Every structure is written in C-alpha cells, then in structure tokens.
Design a protein with these regions (language model features):
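Conserved C-terminal alpha-helix-loop-beta "cap" of PLP-dependent enzymes
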Residues: 162, 181-236
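Conserved PLP-enzyme active-site core in the AAT-like
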Residues: 1-178
Length: 236
C-alpha cells in the first residue's frame, strides 16, 4: 500500500527481494505514490525502485526525477489513445548500481551473448541493454512495426489529450461528490482527499482521467448503473 510506513515496508523485505514496485496513481483506488519515500527505502536495501507510470504518463509525472530507477508504461492506455494496439515501455534511468552483489546476471558472463558482462560492457546502460538483447530475445516481447507506428501517432497529441482528460475527470469528480446517490469519490484534486497534497507535488499539472467512486445501494445499484451507461463501455 502507498500508505505503508517505512517500518512496514522494511519488514516486508527478504534476502531474495530484488526490487520495490509501485504505481504513480494506483488502479483502481487512485492512491498517489510517495515516490521519494519508496526510492529511499529501495536504495537503502540495495534494490531498484520500479514505478508503473501508466495512468500519469510522462506528461504529468516523471518518476525518475524523484528517485525511481526504472519506469514502465502500458502503451495500450493513454499513450495509444485509440485502443488500437497492445504494448509496453521500459524506461531505464541508468541510476542504479547493478554491481552491488545482488544481481550476478549483470556482473557475470552471459554465455548466450559471447560471454558479455553487461556492467563492464555497457556501464549505466547495463539493465536496458540486457532487457533488449537477452530478455526480449528469450521472451519474445517485441512490438510489431505497425503497432509502433500507432503508438507514435498517439504520442503526438498526448500532452493535449492528457490535459483534457485531467480537466474532465476533475469536473466529473466534483460533480459526483455532490450527487445524492454517490457514497464516496476518490480523486486527488477533491478537498479532503488524503492524496491532495501529495498530488500537488508529484502531479502538479493534473491527475489523469481515472476516477474511483462508490454508489449507495451496493452491488445491485452498481449493476443497474453499469447496464444504464450509454456513452461508456464496460471493459475488463
């Protein structure tokens, strides 16, 4: 949980823990991650902080600037913008020391790649080079050329789109908060939201387009609401 204390997070570490992971904006709770706190704990334990920045996109937040070592995105969401392809992105900040003794796969020869020692051959780029040359080769997670083209098309208007998404979500969240059939609304810009101050630090230009809310009336009310939607689709 983003609200776990440093002691609670520390207690969860094991000798074989290899990374600390979090989401800039959590799905579906819309909690905002204290990136600097999690980076501090990760580095104290000699592991990288990996942040899923899908909801925020690089337009609203750049986690590496707050101490994250690796950032991942599902490009199928906002980066695409049209739901036309499936893909993902890994961004390596080049900030983590892979020679600290916990990651022999970077410091010992890779027999499948002519005995390459990634930290010696590529320095700060060791992680991302290994991901591209060995891991992608072995797992086959390769974007199609046309899929990459569609992503590029979506990236061009991304700053404008995510600005409008954030403005719309803010307006809808405030409207829902006042509705008599709504039990609760979670969106960081609302007064009283526990993440409002943190969002002002990490997401000063908007909090993306996803809202979480609960209806009065429980499951039956939720089912009626979903079945009554005209402009939105039920997607899982």
């Amino acid at each position: 949980s983003p609200e776990a204390s440093e002691d609670e997070i520390q207690a969860a570490f094991r000798p074989n823990t290899k990374a600390l992971f979090g989401e800039t904006i959590a799905n579906p709770s819309i909690e905002v991650l204290d990136i600097e706190k999690f980076a501090r704990i990760a580095h104290r334990n000699g592991v990288p902080l990996i942040v899923d920045n899908t909801f925020a996109t690089p337009v609203l937040c750049r986690p590496i600037e707050f101490g994250a070592d690796i950032v991942v995105h599902s490009t199928t969401k906002y980066m695409d913008g049209h739901a036309l392809q499936m893909g993902g992105v890994i961004v390596d900040g080049g900030t983590f020391d892979w020679t600290n003794g916990k990651f022999p796969e970077f410091t010992e020869p890779d027999d499948s790649y002519h005995g390459t020692i990634y930290t010696q051959a590529f320095g700060k780029a060791a992680y991302i080079v290994k991901a591209r040359t060995q891991i992608m080769r072995d797992m086959g997670a390769c974007q199609t050329p046309f899929g990459a083209f569609l992503i590029n098309q979506g990236l061009e208007p991304l700053p404008l789109r995510i600005e409008r998404h954030s403005q719309n979500a803010d307006a809808v969240a405030h409207w829902l908060e006042k509705h008599d059939k709504i039990e609760s609304v979670s969106y960081p810009t609302l007064e009283g939201n526990p993440y409002k101050e943190r969002a002002a630090k990490y997401l000063p230009n908007g909090c993306s387009g996803v809202i979480s809310f609960s209806l009065k009336g429980g499951r039956e009310a939720g089912a009626r609401f979903i079945d009554s939607l005209k402009m939105a689709s039920l997607l899982v």
